[in-house]
Amino acid sequence: MSKSLKLYAGSALGAAIILTGAMNFADRNITQLPENAAVMGAAPESPDTMFIAAATASGAEAEGPFGLGREALPEEIAAWDIDIRPDGKGLPEGRGNVWDGEGVFVEQCAVCHGDFGEGVGRWPVLTGGFDTLTDQRPVKTTGSYWPYLSTVWDYVHRAMPFGNAQSLTDDEVYAITAYLLNMNGLVDGDFELSHENFSEVTLPNEDGFYMDDREELELPEFTRDPCMENCKESVEITMRAAVLDVTPDEAVQTMEESGEDHGTDMAAADDGAATEAEADTAEDAETPALDMALVDEGEKVFRKCKACHQVGDGASHRVGPQLNGVMGRELGAAEDFRYSSTMEEMGEEGIVWTEETMAEFLAKPRSYVKGTKMSFPGLRSDEEIAAVTEYLKSFSQ
Amino acid sequence: MTTSFKGTKPSRRQFLSGAAAAGAGTFVAAQARAAGDPAITELQPWTQQLGDGVDVAPYGMPSEYESHVKRRTVEWLTADPISSINFTPLHELDGIITPNGLCFERHHGGAAHIDPAEHRLMINGLVETPLVFTMQDLMRFPRENHVYFLECAANSGMEWRGSQLNGCQFTHGMIHNVMYTGIPLRLLLQEAGVKTEGKWILPEGADAAAMTRSIPMEKALDDCLVAFKMNGEALRTEQGYPVRLVVPGWEGNMWVKWLRRIEVGDKPWHHREETSKYTDLLADGKARRFTWEMDAKSVITNPSPQAPLTHGKGPTVLTGMAWSGRGTIPRVDVTTDGGITWHQARISGPSLDKSMHRFYYEFDWDGGPLYLQSRAHDSTGYVQPTKDQLREFRGVNSIYHNNGIQTWYVNEEGIAENVEIS
């Protein structure tokens, strides 16, 4: 009796024995394949070609059907199938006007894109740029470059706001889309966009695209015997990278030297300097002892906050304020951040971020601070809240 | 700072200012002749004392002397570090396989951390039966193993207007080459039963960008894979754990990571990443769309600005990578004089379809200036063009698909720089 059969001899399920035995046999058979001249053909010329033959042999596996998986339920498909096409397929019923769009845009989008879609920092410019596509520096916006309005609707709906995707209502997406059209001068201020008139709106650059034609245009030109000898008379340098000098330098990429405001400097933190930063934090944390395990836990939870909030060395405001020193401070007190009026008023009344207020806020942000700009729905568990609070405390001492 | 020569990485500025350790090798050699090399004559601690026990690193990491071998980002390229990019250190690698931890990252909504037990893959749209698979279901389909390169369409995109970034990591590092283990997408589509009018698929990611791209059915049924392993182990988080799409030879953006859904439709969707982005604006203000295939390309990785020649004149190994989205690379030419004379390089290692190839050219460096270029030929007969040839067709606003020939100028000190030449 073979070793494998002995192993399975005690099994009560005869079928299982047969099945396993069959697989075991198949497995061995596969390992023997290379010795089979009929399958491999003539002896390959070199190890390399043997590798190719083995790697490109395909169609050997069974083609099914395998009866795997289960039927998707209509409500499951509805939850995930949110894509929109230029012909309007997938567009849900709804409506929104320019006026409402401006309100939502200023609250949800302007922090990165600017109040008028002009773009803050290197965040995308959404408006203008008409007739610049042949310029030295083309400005590719929803107005000047995007071919279809459905693309705008679909993208805002699936991926915006950055860090809180798929949180906008359908009507809000209609409204933002209407506002973008208005800012691009394509509709009047009293325009309302809905599923009914959606297909009537065309974007100026719809005809600015055509199918890849490299095969006809470039490939014939680039498919020819190249020169190998005496191909040119002389060689001169016409351009050098050192002139621009924009390459990141190892020597200036360490955390110590990026002490000045590097804005969004998380890359430097990845650069192995993160351990230094952590060590510093631990040293500073001599006053009320922190639960470091909880801080670590909180760092993981903070991933949910990271898209909008920065904390630590060089943290700056993004969609949300930077959070250094937040614990123990009044609400709405970080300098140079535009808070909601409620948040500011609560701070002025002397309400301070403590474990208790933070817990209340993070459980249900919009009910604790009515009108808060933070669109994050809140953390589900008390454990997560405690952990992230401890993590924030580590940057507040 | 270690005294080991390999571990010493003088900064680029030091190199450019001429203060490189170019003579270090010669110095050590001279010392050795005088009094015997202390690396040999003195008892080394690692020879005398015991090393680490077996379980010091249950998941092994590279030697501490290799800590400079890492992905690097270019901060000014993107608005923030989440929807951003970093680059594979090509100049530190050899062979054809990219180690998993060095594969460049490009995320549009950050690298999602997904519990595989909570992950589902749905196939819906124009199919007989819309289906949902768990990871466990997927593991029961037949698998295949293939080595493919993945190149971002924007690789070398910063170089359209001229030499900009000094280092092949930055000019060419949006590429990696790994062995994928995955299920032929064809089998999953057949399981759901594609209706005759189903001509396109829309893969979608589960991340915060919910990445989508339209892919023609012909490609989907041809060689696409739904992959869960890279180089034998689970996909890395940043490469789409637990499951990603593999679209061999086509631009990296289409290889949707954290794949959660595939819809079958009768027309393309024209979503953001195939209209606003990943379209190639030409000089006349019109743009090419659906430029999926990656043209044949190559780059010399050593020497290059981050890997100068530090050994002085004499025997020198030039090496680099070549690849094509249309097949294999039967031939690579290299020149050391800026293209007056070309030589056929030696390709070593497996030559696989839509995979990176490794080439070498050994020569005696006379200590004079070098103008290094490489030129890939692919199995369709296509020959990698010069940057100027590309500009003639496309202008300088394309951003994507820059596969022009790269030039490194190496001066008498062995310092290399990204340049363009006549």
Which residues make up each language-model segment?
Chain B
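Structured, non-membrane catalytic/scaffold regions adjacent to prosthetic-group chemistry
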Residues: 35-422
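Intrinsically disordered/low-complexity terminal segments and short unstructured peptides
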Residues: 1-2, 7, 25, 46, ...
